[in-house]
Regions:
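Macrodomain-like recognition of ADP-ribose-binding/processing modules
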Residues: 1-177
Length: 177
């Protein structure tokens, strides 16, 4: 599915820490939601966004409202969509870093209630352009996201087919779950 059309309150965009949204979901966010890009550049310049410390942008309008052909026909069109800018790499030229992703997931686990996140959509962090493998990232993401007491969705990379055996409960959460 298309994460930007999810019904989740908070949508995650994987980013670097230097303020460049050149490819992938980040590039799409940059062009579809210019305010997100402006905020992203600001938090990069001010060093508020760094590996292990995502930045939550609490926008005041919904994605549904902005993407719909007939916004006035939408129920609940006044609900805001927030963006979680989640660093997966320091510089856009580099590969994503598993340790930084894990630290960011720990931040989400430790701060989602305080920040008011009520539901969360995430891409497969670092997979695709970040050059990490779902077999490594999937279980890590599921470990942390399963600890959240809110609805969560993970959107798999469109560029590569994830083998079915890597999508089982045993593969993602271990056999003791």
């Amino acid at each position: 599915g298309d994460m930007f059309f999810s019904k989740m309150q908070t949508v995650t965009v994987s980013v670097n820490c230097v303020g460049v949204m050149g490819k992938g979901l980040a590039s799409r966010a940059k062009y579809q939601f210019p305010d997100v890009y402006v905020r992203y550049q600001d938090v990069c310049r001010s060093k508020r966004l760094r590996m292990g410390v995502p930045y939550l942008y609490k926008r005041e309008s919904s994605l549904e409202h902005e993407l719909a052909d007939e916004p006035s026909s939408l129920p609940n069109a006044n609900l805001a969509t927030w963006f979680l800018l989640f660093p997966t790499k320091q510089h856009w030229r580099e590969a994503s870093v598993i340790r930084g992703i894990e630290e960011g997931l720990q931040w989400v686990r430790d701060n989602y209630v305080k920040e008011g996140i009520s539901s969360l959509a995430m891409p497969a962090l670092g997979c695709g352009l970040g050059r990490l493998e779902w077999r490594d990232i999937g279980p890590l993401m599921c470990h942390y996201l399963s600890a959240l007491n809110i609805p969560t969705s993970i959107y798999l990379p469109a560029e590569q087919k994830v083998p079915e055996e890597l999508l089982t409960k045993e593969s993602l959460l271990g056999s003791g779950s």
